[in-house]
UniProtKB/Swiss-Prot annotation:
Gene3D superfamilies in the record: Phosphorylase Kinase, domain 1, Transferase(Phosphotransferase) domain 1
Source species of the chain: Bos taurus (Bovine)
Subcellular location: Nucleus; Cytoplasm; Mitochondrion; Cytoplasm, Cytoskeleton, Microtubule organizing center, Centrosome
Record keywords: Acetylation, Apoptosis, ATP-binding, Biological rhythms, Cell cycle, Cell division, Cytoplasm, Cytoskeleton, Isopeptide bond, Kinase, Mitochondrion, Mitosis, Nucleotide-binding, Nucleus, Phosphoprotein, Serine/threonine-protein kinase, Transferase, Ubl conjugation
Binding of ATP, residues: 10-18, 33
Protein name per UniProt: Cyclin-dependent kinase 1
Modification N6-acetyllysine, positions: 6, 9
Residues bearing PTM Phosphoserine: 39, 178, 248
Pfam family, one: Pkinase
Amino acid sequence: MEDYTKIEKIGEGTYGVVYKGRHKTTGQVVAMKKIRLESEEEGVPSTAIREISLLKELRHPNIVSLQDVLMQDSRLYLIFEFLSMDLKKYLDSIPPGQFMDSSLVKSYLYQILQGIVFCHSRRVLHRDLKPQNLLIDDKGTIKLADFGLARAFGIPIRVYTHEVVTLWYRSPEVLLGSARYSTPVDIWSIGTIFAELATKKPLFHGDSEIDQLFRIFRALGTPNNEVWPEVESLQDYKSTFPKWKPGSLASHVKNLDENGLDLLSKMLIYDPAKRISGKMALNHPYFNDLDSQIKKM
């Protein structure tokens, strides 16, 4: 830690306080995440250290790079590249009645998918994607932050400030207690973020797990074994769930064209095995008119 000075506290993440800092010799500005673990006495589990060390290998233009892992007084500090704005703050800053430019929505979605495909190809899941951990710079680049931390530390039910961790972007298989899940969980989250890029509003904003599920069911219909084989045998599926009929996504997401709605519907397919993959999503016609500079990134 002696290589870095803390400049100021910039926020509170899922796992602890985040500081803006500076490397003493290079002058490079960084984000320093202090990881607060449940069991302070035992120190940091070696499994977490191993997991985190692997994340230093994830180098991609759309992934916030982990530059250093430091220990101080049995506290773990993760040193990341610094970006000053997250997507939630950006969406909140757009004046009422105005929306993000449709070409920027497309560019951001494409970059998010590029980042996710890179990580999925290395068998790393995110599991907790949301606008707060998508960081942007002033050049139109968006990067995914906090990759792999869920596996290293678990996802707490509450942030250490006792704020409840958001469920709005969580996939139905996770909400229904599936023990085995994979890369499609991230695609679902990206789908809900895609809708929010277009409308500035969370697509499904539940305030409990059951409320979250019912908001999804009301929009997309209550799933059954016909549309999603074996869903009825998932741990938290109840035969007493109200049986809603599928509605139209277009009524929930007004600012997307036909191709955009088609891609969104493929990202929000109930059956994880049928949900579009990141790689397939990048080749969807929605991106046909995307600036070739972004495709080359």
